[in-house]
């Protein structure tokens, strides 16, 4: 684990370290052609009340580390920002969870055990203490840790569920969501496509939905969120493989299916702040949703440039269009109302959408 005070990596030192490791040729050209000191103004995305300055690569990994796919984001009550990434194969450091302060300065890193598997990352206050919940798609576990990385518990597939008795390998959890009573929901998005419910102490309480393409059926339930904006909290599921959103009561009763591929194509996850919900869409954009889950804004929509989902993720930074997203995988509102976006691209990308 690394403590505060370690210097943040500059682009020059980053490139030098990677050259020493013999991998500079594989790096995105952003690190060579970065223009943040050139005086060039960051592009602006959105309109009206949803207008943001788009600052790509706002968070840089510490010296000796190379981002892998940047998958998960959260922020604690003190303002610290947590980034989960898979760790690039060329990285000289192996920590998969990297922590920054509100100004983007490196604080600490931990979690070498999540290398290759860091995916969903959520934070919850329980009593007076905050905890991280990690979904590890490599070890196929949900892991609860302290904010500095000490394990509280690890859970694999629910042995009480007959769906996993013959094929426990089908459990590949992608994200969690939290109910007000302490329960939490696990989306088995890369495994069985079930949505599972657990108590605060990890007891299996049953399934919310099963695989399929009809109402109350899921295909890659990639992320979920308990939405507090209405009269009663609802479980909102990013049914990514079906290119839609579904809502349920907290007990699992299906309420609504929302499909609008003209505006929302491959929802990955959610977070709410005030009356708005942010939704990273793997198909080239970040969406802002209203209380009815209608798209109020499409931010940084790069669909026209990108074409098929993921087809440009392996290209160099020089081939990325400023102000356009490639594959947004997670997004959160920061405490000040700005939005932070993590993208599923090699040698990841963390973009700050700063309110204008």
Predicted segment positions?
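N-terminal secretory signal peptides
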Residues: 1-9
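Blade/loop signatures of beta-propeller domains
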Residues: 35-54
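N-terminal export leaders
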Residues: 10-25
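Beta-rich, blade/repeat-based domains predominating
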Residues: 66-78, 114-128, 160-183, 213-234, ...
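Beta-strand-rich domains and repeat architectures in extracellular enzymes and scaffolds
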Residues: 56-92
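Blade-level signature of beta-propeller repeat domains, shared across WD40, Kelch, NHL, RCC1
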Residues: 327-356
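Conserved beta-propeller blade signature
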Residues: 81-82, 131-133, 184-185, 234-236, ...
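Surface-exposed loop and turn segments in beta-propeller and other repeat-based domains
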Residues: 59-64, 110-114, 153-167, 205-216, ...
């Amino acid at each position: 684990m690394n403590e505060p005070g370690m210097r943040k990596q500059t682009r020059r030192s980053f490139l030098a370290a990677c050259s020493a490791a013999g991998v500079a040729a594989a790096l995105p050209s952003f690190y060579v052609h970065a223009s943040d000191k050139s005086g060039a103004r960051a592009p602006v995305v959105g309109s009206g009340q949803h207008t943001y300055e788009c600052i790509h690569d706002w968070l840089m990994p510490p010296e000796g580390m190379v981002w892998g796919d940047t998958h998960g984001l959260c922020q604690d009550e003190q303002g610290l920002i947590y980034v989960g990434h898979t760790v690039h194969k060329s990285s000289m450091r192996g920590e998969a969870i990297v922590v920054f302060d509100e100004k983007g300065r490196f604080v600490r890193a931990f979690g070498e055990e999540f290398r290759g598997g860091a995916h969903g990352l959520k934070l919850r206050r329980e009593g007076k203490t905050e905890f991280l919940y990690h979904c590890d798609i490599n070890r196929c576990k949900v892991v609860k840790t302290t904010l500095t990385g000490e394990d509280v518990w690890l859970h694999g597939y629910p042995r009480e569920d007959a769906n996993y008795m013959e094929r426990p390998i089908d459990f590949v959890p992608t994200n969690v969501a939290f109910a007000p009573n302490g329960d939490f929901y696990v989306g088995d998005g890369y495994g069985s496509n079930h949505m599972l419910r657990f108590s605060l102490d990890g007891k299996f309480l049953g399934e919310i939905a099963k695989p399929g393409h009809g109402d109350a059926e899921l295909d890659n339930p990639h992320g979920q969120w308990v939405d507090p904006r209405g009269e009663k909290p609802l479980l909102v599921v990013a049914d990514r493989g079906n290119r839609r959103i579904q809502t349920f009561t907290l007990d699992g009763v299906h309420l609504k299916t929302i499909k609008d591929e003209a505006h929302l194509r491959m929802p990955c996850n959610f977070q709410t702040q005030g009356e708005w919900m942010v939704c990273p869409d793997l198909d080239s954009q970040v969406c802002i949703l209203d209380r009815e889950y209608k798209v109020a804004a499409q931010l940084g929509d790069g669909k026209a440039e990108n074409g098929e989902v993921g087809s440009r993720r392996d290209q160099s930074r020089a081939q990325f269009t400023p102000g356009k997203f490639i594959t947004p995988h997670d997004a959160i509102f920061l405490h000040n109302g700005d939005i932070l976006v993590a993208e599923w691209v090699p040698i990841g990308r963390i973009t700050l959408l700063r309110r204008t």
